[in-house]
Amino acid sequence: MAQLFFRYGSMNSGKTIEILKVAHNYEEQNKTVAIFTSGIDDRDQVGFISSRIGLKREATPIFSDTNIFEIVANIKPKPNCVLLDESQFLEKEHVFQLAKIVDELNIPVIAYGLKNDFRNELFEGSKYLLLYADKLEEMKTICWFCAKKATMVLRVDDKGKPVYTGEQIMIGGNDHYYPVCRKCHANPPIK
């Protein structure tokens, strides 16, 4: 029985490398995967997932008008698994499409993404994945500043100063975001 998984974690928790590993494991057994990523994440190149350790792979970009269900339903042969990177950027309708892939096509879907933003508020995609996923799995990493578990994301400006207000989505990597614990989010030891 297929299920919808949401594997969430802070920045640097290994979400993208995990997608690449899962895809490799399926393909090593001659099984197919369909890989998707957000079309707004252009840090490396639209239509690719790229891990911080340098591995990169092509993926179908998702935009507002993308119908993920229709794309997957038309893939021949039917994929054995659907993998999504940057799933926090999904819209509510996209999450419903993922559930439909599981329920109607009987294909497991594994979505990876951040749970909360730099203000510690849920992203739209994460909110609906938390509500509709059959299984929730936390991917862990440590705080950038101390040894505690990182559960939040700290945004910094170009001068390295913490930012707690502003637009929810600003694409960036370690130059603007850090995985942090609750204590360091509230009072980061930045000079």
UniProtKB/Swiss-Prot annotation:
InterPro entries named in the record: P-loop_NTPase (IPR027417), Thymidine_kinase (IPR001267), Thymidine_kinase_CS (IPR020633)
Biological-process GO terms, alphabetical: DNA biosynthetic process; thymidine metabolic process
Key words, A-Z: ATP-binding, Cytoplasm, DNA synthesis, Kinase, Metal-binding, Nucleotide-binding, Transferase, Zinc
Pfam families to which the protein is assigned, alphabetical: TK (PF00265)
PROSITE patterns for this protein: TK_CELLULAR_TYPE
Catalysed reactions listed for this entry: thymidine + ATP = dTMP + ADP + H(+)
Gene3D superfamilies recorded: 3.30.60.20, P-loop containing nucleotide triphosphate hydrolases (3.40.50.300)
GO cellular component, one term: cytosol
Principal cellular location given in the protein's record: cytoplasm
Transferase keyword on record: yes
Active site feature: 86
Subcellular localization(s) per the UniProt record: Cytoplasm
Record: residues binding ATP: 9-16, 85-88
Taxonomic superkingdom: Bacteria
A single MF term (Gene Ontology): ATP binding
Binding site for Zn(2+): 143, 146, 181, 184
E.C. number: 2.7.1.21
Subunit structure: Homotetramer.
Protein family membership: Belongs to the thymidine kinase family.
Protein name per Swiss-Prot or TrEMBL: Thymidine kinase
Record organism: Listeria monocytogenes serotype 4b (strain F2365)
Classification of source organism: Bacteria, Bacillati, Bacillota, Bacilli, Bacillales
Name of the gene: tdk
